[in-house]
Amino acid sequence: MSSLLVALPVAAHTLPPNPPLRIVATEQPTRTVAQVASEPPDATNTLRIVLLLPLESPLLRRAAVSVREGAAAVFGTRKTDVAVRECSYSTDGVVAAYSRCVDDKVDWVIGPLGRTDVTTLALAKMPSLRPTLMLSPLGTVPPQPMAVLAPDIESEGEAIAQQAVEDACRRPVLVEANSALASRVSVSIMSYWRGHIATPLAQATLGSRDTWRRLTDGWRRDNVDCILFAGGASVLSELRPFLRNMAVYVTSASFESALERTTDWTGVRIADAPWLVDADRAEFAAYLPAEPPSPTLARLYALGVDAARLVIAAGREALPATFAGAIGQLTLKDAQYRRHPMIGEFRERSLVKVGP
């Protein structure tokens, strides 16, 4: 899954203390939804939701917990009309878990999480498939009644390229550093540029640190005014002092640690989730965690918030065609939500929204 799903170490996370969320049942291999204890009197109006997450996966458990906590924050505000069942699985058991936990009484399934599991489930041709909001990209139109909600680094690359154009950058350079997501960011920036701008975009690859002074001095001689950066946070922090008087544009791939560590980033513009860029937005207030997580886990938390809000908005009908999400402005096309991230700017160890 995009920049948000990286190999994260196992951590002992649980739902927030005494969550108001009404869990009808947690995952137990010998039970099905139909065997859960009797429903409350208003059961016919209760929206039944299964959270299908890799809580048993060593690599994805921490990410899954963050998604679960975000969803729990939303469901906790609807405790009288939403019943949620957790259904965990390991890396090789998503189809078995779906079969075990989902029957025709379920209104929505949220999950799975992880590109491999999403692909496996979509191709499984389940005999009893319920409306399912999958949380990683599939790469093709999902089968009915499945849909995809997945944050992607590519939309952020396109957004910073567009912002650089709107900011009237005259001599921009795409700078790629060695990182896990750098090539994907670069490809998305170049794709946008070729499709919208007649002038070719110059490119450069960062070498060893002892070459940076010569490289950036050359940019100044060439009147380079904007840097579209594809790389990680640590490289950006080291490179930033060499980029004085140049506008810098980055994606969430460059923002991985706390704001306190962005001391020298003032003026850097970023395409990221509104949850991080516009954190004081009124509609987010009810869902904020007690302790703010790292930016990476915060994006996963926001994914859980959006997944829960979308299925509640849908109820037993179709998903909303457009939605102001915590991960971005969302538009549903071909059963997949296309995401438009928000542009923010770092200012003295804070992040503020750019524009209205």
Language-model features: locations:
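Extracytoplasmic "Venus flytrap"
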Residues: R31-E69
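Beta-alpha junction/loop-to-helix N-cap segments that form part of ligand/metal-binding clefts
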Residues: R62-S66, K79-V141, V235
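Structural motif
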Residues: D81-D103, E156-A159, R184, L206-D217
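Periplasmic-binding protein-like
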Residues: V102-G114, T132-L135, R171-E176, L201, ...
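Short beta-strand elements at the ligand-binding edges of bilobed clamshell
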Residues: G139-Q163, D264-W275
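An alpha-beta-alpha
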Residues: M146-A204
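Extracellular/periplasmic periplasmic-binding protein-like sensory domains
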Residues: R194-G195, D222-V224, S237-V305
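Segments of small-molecule ligand-sensing domains
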Residues: Y287-P356
